[in-house]
Each structure stands twice: as structure tokens, then as C-alpha cells.
């Protein structure tokens, strides 16, 4: 035993002796040999693998010297993986033991490799061994590690929907990153993605491993079909079945995904020397929005990731977007079409029956050039979507087969595709009773609950009728509304409220009131058109004319006790809205009806000539444009029962926004005379001559105080002193009450007139008044 130990020590000395003259290098070599001899297990020969050696070094805390970082391929790992693919897990463990290496594959890795391994494509026996060897050699030359894009027999798929270039502002700007954690419930990642989808304008590109969130798919469908934004989906082949299951539950196929491309992608392929291979998964997850920003991270498009799983994403801007743009182009070139969702550029895959074309609203479509094939420069791809140039998604709701897809509603349904000759996606698993509702409203029933959108799964529903349809019934179908027309002698329809009360609660108009047809026609003819070039909206009361016309068909009599109440309520509702001025001009249209019997033809024509719209000023004066019908003269006895407390017709008019001086000028001279009748009689010619010409019967707002004071004194003098020379002039309360009729021919409140017109008009009246005062 001692000899063995001495021999061992002598062996080490001999091994280290040739390096004794080399100084420190010899000491390091002998030290490494001693250490390896101590850690080497008994009964083993040769050196341990690199992974085992490094682990043993790191387990000893006293080891001070750090080994250099070696970035090289592990041949032991390659041999073990090939043995696993060719002969199974037992051969893998045997190679690990022989190479003195650690079992580096986990149980998850071993299961994936064994379940996804596939061999070389088998050839027929008639070819013989020579043909087999020749084909294998040619296959080895073609599928070498060198990439020959121009010699490829298959062109990569085109970005046929369009792909914009990276904006220059994005390419030259520095990288900006904002991190979003799923732990922050106030700012969830799903809400961020939905917001970005709603704001996209040029393109949306999604690379995702698992996609089972229905809300996110609806957002992408709305962006593609409603707003015409091209959408590209690259989904992992491993979890593609879950996406197809979601589409089956929603009763979706390729015909519904308008302006959207769905393709599958996978990872790299690992090949052994014997020809066994397996393909990895595509675990990249990022979203490109308009080639301006990228959202990348660990978030998957699943309900659990939005509610339970924790994840994080980075929202990136700047020139880093170009790297993601290049990566997406590479992934899209390597992707494969999805059965049932392939486009016209995939001739090898079964096509989904396309709906009939829709007549374009802006001319024929322009075929787009290819942009991703190697023969044509991939960087100069399509700059806009063909759907943006075409307006097929803007078709009217009954205009063709693509209407439902373009407008984002349900498509013709499963029955449509079955009639076309090819069943829709997973139709062999659907319920045989699942039939689209017949009739011309089949496309519109999706919004009413009869489509599979309102069902959890078509395979679980044994009835083609939606629960919402059973509960509500056929009234949900759109029906044409009959045209309503007025007939003579029918009750008046309820009109819009003018004083804040609906027609049913109006105290002045009972519910059983009948409006004759002639009165309604008169109201319609006398409606004043609203000027859209001004900012005012003057509302006139149409029923005031019908109530005061006093025609033979009207039921309102002069001696009715409710006449004053109705006229007062009608006058109160004559409120015109003015948005650009502080004054509200209220026009009394009923006075002209009561006074038309006493006006001379000359004054009536003069009044009609003043009914013009002043478009040069800021307000819209609405005046009766048709001559008032001659009302029957009402005797003064008819007003004896009205009561002395009833104010005059002008006093009952409510003015808003006028100055206090204007109100005093308007109402002062008549309130001091005491109560008068509610409706004035005919004005006497003496009173008309005593006041002045008809040009001085207009109240103006915004004038100087001198003009208003002068006018006030003129009215006071005309009231207190009758015209001399005509004895026996009646002076009574009726005359006092009829002083409001002095301004009857011209009851329009004018705002914003020029000073020259006002000065000219008032100088004419002042000259006559001042001369008569000085002479007396």
C-alpha cells in the first residue's frame, strides 16, 4: 500500500518534472493534475467532461483562480443527443456515462425530443440502393448550411396586404423603453394592447406563441375590417390548435378575417448524423404597431395571462424598431399557411370559398406588386394596403356577400360554405342541427343573438335558434316604418316642448284639442326657414297663428274666458335663442292678426316691405312673410268681462337680456295709466295722428340715452294732451290701453343697424315733434 502511494507520488513528480524549468507554468500544471486525481472517481479512466469539471470547481469555495470562459461546442452533448434521437433514453444515459459528463437534459427536454422526432423520408424499394445514395447526396448538397435565395424552388410568401417602411423619425431617434408589469392592476398589459390596436393606422404585426383571447381577436378584426388596417398573425405551430379551437367556438374561418393573414411558424430544426430530426418551438412574442413602436415581453394572448399569470412587456420606440421589423420579415418568410385561413398566394393549401366580389365604389382594384420575394427587393415592399385603395369593406348592408365581413358582422355562416362545396373549419365536429337562419335577414341576425357569437360553442348547442331569439322573437327584425301624414279633422300630434313641458303636460293646450287641417296647412306655409350661415336659432310658435286666426273652422271664440290664458301661454313660449348676442329678440306675431283689420292698405304694404332678412348683421329677424288673414272686428263689449287686471298684449311679452332703461321706456308710459283691456280696440285716427309717422314705431336697443329720453317725453306728451282741433275725442281707458298699438305696424326690435339709418329715421320724427312743441 505504501509502495502504491510512493509510486503515485513518483508518477506525479515524473509528469511534472519536464515542466520544472518553466517556472510558474510547471507549477500550475502539476497542481491541476493533483486536483484532478483527487476528484476523479475510483475505477474511471480519462478526463471528465467540461461541464462536470466546471461544476466540481465551483463547488469548492477555497478555489480562488477563475477558469477562462470557453465558448465552444460540446462534442459530448452532441453525441448524447444523437443517441437519444436514434436509440432512446437508455442509449443517451450510456453515452453520458462513457463521456463522464453530467445528464444535461431535463425530463421535459427528453419528452419533447422523443415525442417530436421524425426520420428521413422513406423512398420506394424500386429505386434501389444506388438511387438512394445519389438522392441523399443531392439532398445534402441542396440543404447545406449555405443559403441560396435565388436558387430556391419556392418563393417566400409576400406581404400582400402591404407593409410600410420604418419612418425616418423612428429610424434615427434614440431607443426609448417603458416597462409594464402585470402586477400593476391599474395599468394592465391587455388594456395597453387593446389601446394600441385601436390606434393603429398602417399595420399590425403579431408574433405570439399562444393566442386564445377572444377580445383581442375581436379588436384585431375590427382594425382590419372596419378601419382597413393590414393585420399579420404569426402563431406558434405547437399551440396553433388552441387558436383554431377558439375560432371554431366563435364560428370563424378565413372568410371572416378580412384584410388579415394568419400563418404558423416554428423554431429551428435539429438534425442528427443518422438523419433523425426534430423542430423546436417559436417562443418569440412581440407586436409591431405602424412600424413605430414595439411591445415585446413574456405576455401571451390568453385569459390566464391577463388575470392570473404574471408577466412583463417592454414598450419600445426608436431605431430598435428596425431590428424587430427585420426579424418579422424573416419569420414571415419561413412561416407556413394555416389550413382554412390561407390566402390566394398559397396554391398548395385548400382554399376557403371566397364570397362573390362586390362592386367597387372608387373604380377597379389595382393589383399590388410583390414585396417579400427574393427576386424583388424585399425592402421595397408594398407601401399601402389594397383594401385602403378599394372600398369593398364600405359596402352597404345588403349589397353582397362581403358585406358582413367588411362591416365586421357575421358572415353568411356555415351553410354558405357548405353550399359552396367545401365545409368550413372543423365542420365535421359541429352539431348536425347547426343551420344558419334562413331569410333575407340572415346577415343581420348576428347582432340580434341568432349567430354563434352569442353561443359558447356550436358543438354544445343542439338548436339552431339562439336563446336571445327565443326570448325576444321576431320583433327584433328590422321593419319598415309607415309614413305618418296629417289628415283634415284629426287630433294634432304631440309636438316638441317649447317651454320645457311636453305636449301632454301643456296647460294651454288640452289633450282633446282638435286642430283643423286648414290651420295646419297655414302653419306649415308660414314656417320661416332657418339661416344656416348665422349663429341664431329662432323658434316661432306655430300654434299661436292657428289660435289667433279666428277662421270659421276654429273653435276659439272671442268671448271665451280662456282666451287670455291661452294667448298669454302662447306669447310666453315665443322665445328665440341667440348664441352670439346677449339680447333675445322676441317677435309677437299675434298682434298683426288682431290689428290687421284697422290698418290701412298703405300701411300694410309698408309693413310687408320691411319683412326682409338682414344677413349683413349678426341676428336673424324672423317676421311673418305672408299677410295676416283678416280677423273679425271684436266689439269693445267683448272685453268688459275680461277684467281690468289683464295687461295688454305687449305687456305680456317677456323680454330677456334687455337693458333696464329699454324696459322702462317700453313699459313706463302704459303702466302709469292704470289697467286696461286685455285686447285693445281699434286705434282712433286722432291718436294715430297725435303720435307721429309710422316710421317712429320701432323700439331699438343699444341707442344713446338722449334718443331714449326724447322718445319717452314724446310718448308722455302724446298721452297727456290730445290733438287740438278735434273736439270730443274719446279719452278713456281703452285709449290708454291702446297706446301699445302705436307701434303695431313695426314691432320688430332691431339690433346692430348702422347709426346713419337710426339718425335719419329719428331726425324725421323729431323735426315734426319739436316744431309742434315750440309753436304751442
From Swiss-Prot:
Composition-biased stretches (Polar residues): 452-467, 554-563
Chief localization: cytoplasm
Biased composition annotated in UniProt, kind: Low complexity: 368-385
Chain spans, region DUF1669: 1-340
Keywords associated with the record: Cytoplasm
Subcellular location: Cytoplasm
Annotated region (Disordered), positions in chain: 344-467, 494-565, 617-653, 669-694, 716-745
GO molecular function: protein kinase binding
InterPro entries (alphabetical): FAM83, SACK1
SUPFAM superfamilies in UniProt: Phospholipase D/nuclease
Post-translational modification: Phosphorylated by CSNK1A1.
Compositionally skewed regions (Basic and acidic residues) per UniProt: 523-539
Subunit structure: Directly interacts (via DUF1669) with CSNK1A1 and CSNK1A1L. May interact with RAF1.
Entry text on domains: All members of the FAM83 family of proteins share a conserved N-terminal DUF1669 (domain of unknown function 1669) domain of about 300 amino acids. This domain mediates the interaction with casein kinase 1 (CK1) isoforms. Therefore, it has been proposed to rename DUF1669 the polypeptide anchor of CK1 domain.
Protein family: Belongs to the FAM83 family.
Functional summary from the UniProt entry: May play a role in MAPK signaling.
Protein name per its UniProtKB record: Protein FAM83C
Organism: Mus musculus
Source species taxonomy: Eukaryota, Metazoa, Chordata, Craniata, Vertebrata
Gene: Fam83c
